[in-house]
Amino acid sequence: MRIDIALVNLGLFESRTRAANAVRDGAVFYGDTQITKPSFDVENPDLISVRGAVMPYVSRGGLKLEHALDTFHIDMTGRRMIDIGSSTGGFCDVALRRGVAHIVAVDTGTDQMHSSLRDNPKIELHEQTDFRYIDDSVVGDIDIATIDVSFISVTKILDKLVTLPRLRDVVCLIKPQFECGPELSARFRGVIRDENVRAQTVENVVAAFGAHGFDCRGIVQSPIAGGSGNIEFLAHFVKKH
């Protein structure tokens, strides 16, 4: 039996996704051996243990936003937020715990938001929705945006983002694998290991934000890797008024 399945069967995690993430984060042991592959075959489930801090949020993404808010000293109390690329809700989870007043959660997918967040009255969920085409009435009072998009460059949404009338802060997850272009991404097989390429993608994103009237106040490497081990970055932008 796979160890991620065994973890769920033992009641240690509520889903295979969370179990697999814990394995990748090095929190799961089989006997005295640390296991890092969710596909690891288990013969005796009784030898499985979870050590260290268990994931405090509904997804690993929460650790990324937590790090950004702490690094950039951003207070979420009473803020009205839009979470672009909300997915399971890791960013939403962090924001709620830090006193956000309201969240517009937007994602092109469906049925991804964690069950513990889906019915939260502070979350206004817009699934199967492309942020670029969301109605202006939905985002009129938004003052902070968090961004975690995949398979497109974040620069593609800036024309819409800049139109939000009350927007001030933006916390953006920069993913070099989606910013470098399809040719480079294919050359590196989706994992950008070249530091120069990563640096250039960050520069390109900062320049694009600047061209749309945003100041970059800080950039920090994500505390955890993204999919397939990609190094990612978090940036804080402030809209000029």
Give the residues covered by each predicted segment:
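A short, conserved alpha-helix within the catalytic core of class I
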Residues: 152-166
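Residues at the N-terminus of the alpha-helix immediately C-terminal to the conserved SAM/SAH-binding loop
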Residues: 87-92, 109
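Conserved beta-strand signature within the Rossmann-like core of class I S-adenosyl-L-methionine
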Residues: 166-180
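Short, glycine-/aromatic-enriched active-site segment of Class I SAM-dependent methyltransferases
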Residues: 176-193
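A basic, amphipathic helix-loop patch mediating RNA/tRNA/ribosome contacts
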Residues: 1-46
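Conserved class I S-adenosyl-L-methionine
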Residues: 77-87
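Conserved S-adenosyl-L-methionine
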Residues: 94-102, 167-168
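S-adenosyl-L-methionine
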Residues: 104-156
